[in-house]
Amino acid sequence: KEHLIEAGEEETDHLVWCKKRLDELDGKESIFNPLWYAGSFTIGAIFGRYGEKVSLGFVEETEKQVVIHLDKHLNKISLKDKETIEILQTMRSDEDAHAQQAVENGGEELEIPTKKIMKYTAKVMTSTSAHI
């Protein structure tokens, strides 16, 4: 349980870092952020009802997909933007560690259809946020 509390604190750090960096770059957050947060919380709560192994499997798969998403951003960021790169690399490292911790603590690999639904949902979220 300790690792989940620590991971939650790191996720909060990530949100703060991203908000700060967006402000520095005169960027803006997606208007959908509250919806994404509420949806993610709800989905996490649903998976939590299936027991610890499934819940940890959900954490593992979520973090794996976040790592892939961060890698895509890292490939697009100008090498001159060292501050953003550093933030994303730190986030990537944290997310990868969260996935590994979920496995080490008994996470059960999710079934392929569940992984595909998660991937599709993430794609809808990221593409919608990018355009609105």
Q: What does each model-identified segment do?
A:
Residues 1-132:
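Non-heme di-metal
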